[in-house]
From Swiss-Prot:
Seems to stimulates transcription by the viral polymerase. May play a role in viral pathogenesis or transmission by insects vectors. The P gene has two overlapping open reading frames. One encodes the P protein and the other the C'/C proteins. This is Protein C'. It comes from the Viruses. Belongs to the rhabdoviruses C protein family.
């Protein structure tokens, strides 16, 4: 009986519990990071597309000014 009591209070037990929590949270954190990365990549593509359109419009504006 006494050995069981000591096992429950041992720091090794609490360490393994922490590891359990990390293994549970790790996939969730990874998934959140993936979602954030995808969102940032999508926003970056949008910004690049807008910059391309601005460059095209600037060239057209310069052409019309030259006429």
């Amino acid at each position: 009986m006494r050995s069981k009591h000591n096992e429950m209070k041992s720091p090794i037990m609490s360490c393994s519990k922490r590891t359990e929590w990390k293994s549970i949270l790790s996939p969730l954190i990874f998934r959140q990071q993936m979602i954030l990365t995808q969102n940032l990549n999508q926003k970056l593509k949008t910004i690049k597309a807008c910059m391309y359109q601005i460059r095209k419009l600037s060239k057209l504006k310069a052409l019309y000014k030259g006429l």
